[in-house]
Amino acid sequence: IGFPTAGHPEYGELEGIETTTGPLSQGLANGVGFAIAEQILNTKFGKNLIDHFTYVFAGDGCLMEGLSHEASSLAGHLGLSKLIVFFDDNSISIDGPTSLSVSEDTIERYKSYGWNALSINGHDHDEISNAIISAKKNSAPTLIACKTKIGFGSPNKESKSSSHGSPLGEEEIKLTRENLNWSNKDFEIPDHLLESWRKFSKRNEVLKSKWIANNKKMITSSYF
């Protein structure tokens, strides 16, 4: 829409930004708010109309901020079972390793809030899928700590703070492409991935049509 992508988006500054998630952990707090709204609306109108999960992606820096403590504590207290937070657990901050500034056990911290908390290999698709299935069955909010390597595949910047918030550079991009055996052009989606995405789009169109049909009277009501 004509703007550079904001790394720390603020509501009201540019078109297309619906909410402030610029300050680290603000997005997590927003997610808690969304999950509260879902629970209230689900109770008021029933699961046929409102019944969805809220997903959050958070990093090490997000969970260091005080706001994440307050919001996560509230989520545990309220038992927001439809809140699932993916924690990009790469042990790197913009200043260097997270060990420079934090030494707490994040999994145990979230368990103390009353959360379901687990750790997985964030590069393993099966582990991610199984963790989501498990989280959906739990009666508490879930933190999925995904152990990852920042700058994955970069020969000289993998697991280093130099790949945090900064471009790899043309030469390193070339080396990373070679290392990952990635031959697609910039911003080109491989055909097999595009085909999979389109299958989900078709599935969701069917689900949308069923939802509208089941709730036609409610969603056309003057109440809304």
For the regions a language model picked out, list residue spans one by one.
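Generic detection of intrinsically disordered/low-complexity segments and helix-coil linkers/edges
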Residues: G2-T5, E104, D191, E205
